[in-house]
């Protein structure tokens, strides 16, 4: 792909120039405290390189899903403080997105300074379906860095969105892929274009409908496709099994039956399930065979025999993609499935396999369960973007950089 990199921009020279960076700083918060700083840490290399080179750096990012207007609970203030801490330098926070405070602060930047704009989604034009509205916001963002400025796309978690700060600004400024986006695209290309076999895919999460396109796409490419998490129950139901009060997408049962008919030699389902009476951390766990789930109980994790079988498949793999937990890993009693599969992937990686964790809940599980992040070849910052790439979809935020 003909995408210019951050190194290209640095070679051209950025000292004294305004550089607009779209980062992905959408981290989970609990009462104002950041519970997983992974995306903040991942954004540091690009921002540090630009600051060190003397650029006047203006960062735009979103947090959560505000409704197109300022909302204090979605302010980037705690994120800005954490970002400054990780960078080891002061990060200014503008009081607005492209208003008078942002403009005044941008004009006052000196070489190497970093300004973080307030949550870009406080401006409804960011996510507008109206091209003209998005373009107006993009032009206002460009004004903050000047006509001789540049745009660096470094928020991989949003490149599947056609939004003002992701797509439209790249049509107005010289544009480059940041370190993170550059790495992510190369990693995903390795999964799709130069895959060493055997290729194992592990998919979890709650809904088949969320993963249907990627299942259909990867089932034709993978040697084994392991299904866990809440969505396994719709597959079990498609086999005619009772799943008790487990999560079930009835509208997807026929689709799952077709997938099993077409790809039964590739798809692997759990053979035992950890069940409980209710969705609660203090529910009493009980392990049962997958065809013996009681009517009054719900599945909250895969069982130990499933972990053993899945681990055997993974131990021989040369390429592994994992997206989605095997169970409710947030509850310790139902975390063993996710941890066991993750440890098997780490073991395979140690033997030379190329492993990618596809962002989202999987990345959160790695950190929450205390697993070594360097035990995997790559942990993606973009769950949805990774899946859409592997579905074969064009990502607007990548295509516009070409």
From Swiss-Prot:
Localization of this protein: Cytoplasm
Listed GO biological process terms: gluconeogenesis; glycolytic process
Superkingdom to which the source organism belongs: Bacteria
Keywords from the named record: ATP-binding, Cytoplasm, Glycolysis, Kinase, Nucleotide-binding, Transferase
Classification via InterPro entries: Phosphoglycerate_kinase, Phosphoglycerate_kinase_CS, Phosphoglycerate_kinase_N, Phosphoglycerate_kinase_sf
Pathway as given in its UniProt record: Carbohydrate degradation; glycolysis; pyruvate from D-glyceraldehyde 3-phosphate: step 2/5
Classification via CDD domains: Phosphoglycerate_kinase
Primary subcellular site in the record, as a coarse category: cytoplasm
Pfam families linked to this entry: PGK (PF00162)
Binding site for ATP: 211, 299, 330, 359-362
Protein name: Phosphoglycerate kinase
Organism (species): Mycolicibacterium gilvum (strain PYR-GCK)
């Amino acid at each position: 792909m003909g995408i210019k990199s951050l190194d290209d921009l640095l070679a051209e020279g950025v000292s004294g120039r305004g550089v607009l960076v779209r980062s992905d700083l959408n981290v989970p918060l609990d009462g104002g405290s950041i519970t997983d700083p992974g995306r903040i840490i991942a954004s540091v290399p690009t921002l540090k390189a630009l600051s060190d080179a003397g650029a006047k750096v203006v960062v735009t990012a979103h947090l959560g899903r505000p409704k197109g207007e300022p909302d204090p609970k979605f302010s980037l203030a705690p994120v800005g403080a954490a970002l400054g801490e990780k960078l080891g330098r002061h990060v200014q926070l503008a009081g607005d997105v492209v208003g008078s405070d942002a403009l005044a602060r941008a004009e006052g930047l000196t070489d190497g300074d970093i300004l973080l704009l307030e949550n870009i989604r406080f401006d409804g034009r960011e996510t507008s379906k109206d091209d003209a509205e998005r373009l107006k916001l993009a032009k206002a963002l460009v004004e903050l860095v000047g006509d001789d400025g540049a745009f660096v796309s470094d928020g991989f978690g949003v490149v599947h969105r056609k939004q003002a700060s992701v797509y439209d600004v790249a049509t107005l400024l010289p544009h480059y892929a940041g370190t993170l986006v550059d790495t992510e695209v190369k990693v995903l290309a390795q999964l799709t274009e130069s895959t060493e076999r055997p290729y194992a895919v592990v998919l979890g999460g709650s809904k088949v409908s969320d993963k249907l396109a990627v299942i259909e796409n990867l089932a034709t490419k993978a040697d084994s496709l392991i299904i866990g998490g809440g969505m396994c129950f719709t597959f079990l139901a498609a086999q005619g099994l009772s799943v008790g009060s487990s999560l079930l997408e009835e509208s997807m049962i026929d689709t799952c039956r077709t997938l099993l008919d077409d790809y039964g030699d590739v798809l692997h389902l759990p053979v035992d399930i950890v069940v409980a009476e209710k969705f609660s951390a203090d529910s009493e766990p009980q392990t049962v065979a997958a065809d013996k789930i009681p009517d009054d109980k719900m599945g909250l994790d895969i069982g130990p025999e499933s972990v053993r079988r899945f681990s055997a498949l993974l131990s021989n793999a040369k390429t592994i993609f994992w997206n989605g937990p095997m169970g409710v890993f947030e509850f310790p009693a139902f975390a063993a499935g996710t941890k066991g599969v993750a440890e098997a992937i780490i073991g395979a990686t140690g033997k030379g396999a190329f492993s990618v964790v596809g962002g989202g809940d999987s990345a959160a599980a790695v950190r929450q369960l205390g697993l070594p992040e360097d035990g995997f070849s790559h942990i993606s910052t973009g769950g949805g973007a990774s899946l859409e790439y592997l579905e074969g979809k064009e990502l607007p935020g990548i295509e516009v950089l070409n």
